[in-house]
């Protein structure tokens, strides 16, 4: 599998991740004119699964380091598979709530509150469960990012049309989403040997395999979580699978 050994490249990948994490909500808003978020969310989860498949059969299978995907997936123990699946289910539940909040209260409210809570709580939870890195720079960075998110929310809020009221329901959903999202990574991390990517502990997953199992957890849990939201939406009338397939 391919392993990032360059610090500079790792930072670049982090920036790409941040851009993607902060941009997917825009696609939801663009689609919302004629595509309910409950239906959009199926596209979102299917996209994650397809990307995971592409990743494990390319970067996760090429190279001389570590275990290739097909070799690795066969030896992962059931407990670690379950852990990554649980992480996917938790992430999916939180993201559905965040999407609902975006559709109700708008991105200016949902993202600063939901993602901000997830970021702050997630750093504390994951750092104290597995302390790595310089805490000063880590928590300084967190504070700066949170300030940036808050400023972005304020700026976006001022840009809204006069008279727009943020729904209390949307704020509550964003807060619950943020709290849930802060817990998902520890379950995914528990499935991996984070100390040795080149020769991972037998029975544990490589990052590529863990991400693939995580994506399966998202997709499978969507049949429960999103079906419930489709039948009992937070706002608007129920939607059906027929509407999804007819477009």
Could you say what each language-model-derived stretch is?
Residues 1-247:
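Polytopic alpha-helical membrane proteins, predominantly small-molecule transporters/carriers
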């Amino acid at each position: 599998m391919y392993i990032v050994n360059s610090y500079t490249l790792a930072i670049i990948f982090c920036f790409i991740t941040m851009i993607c994490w902060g941009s997917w909500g825009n696609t939801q808003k663009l689609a919302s004119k004629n595509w309910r978020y409950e239906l959009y969310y199926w596209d979102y989860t299917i996209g994650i699964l397809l990307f995971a498949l592409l990743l494990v059969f390319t970067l996760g299978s090429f190279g001389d380091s570590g275990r290739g995907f097909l070799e690795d997936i066969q030896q992962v123990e059931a407990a670690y598979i379950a852990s990554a699946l649980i992480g996917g289910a938790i992430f999916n539940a939180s993201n559905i709530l965040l999407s609902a909040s975006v559709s109700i209260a708008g991105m200016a409210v949902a993202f600063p509150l939901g993602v901000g809570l997830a970021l702050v709580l997630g750093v504390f939870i994951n750092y104290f469960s597995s302390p790595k890195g310089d805490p000063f720079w880590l928590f300084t960075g967190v504070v700066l990012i949170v300030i940036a998110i808050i400023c972005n929310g304020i700026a976006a809020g001022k840009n809204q049309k006069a008279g727009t009221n943020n729904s209390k329901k949307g704020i509550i959903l964003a807060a619950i989403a943020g709290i849930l999202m802060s817990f998902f990574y520890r379950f995914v991390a528990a499935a991996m040997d984070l100390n040795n990517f080149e020769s991972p502990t037998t029975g544990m997953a490589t990052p590529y395999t863990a991400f693939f199992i995580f994506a399966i957890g998202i997709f499978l849990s969507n049949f429960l979580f999103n079906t419930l939201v489709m039948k009992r939406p937070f706002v608007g009338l129920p939607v059906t699978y027929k509407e999804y397939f007819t477009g």
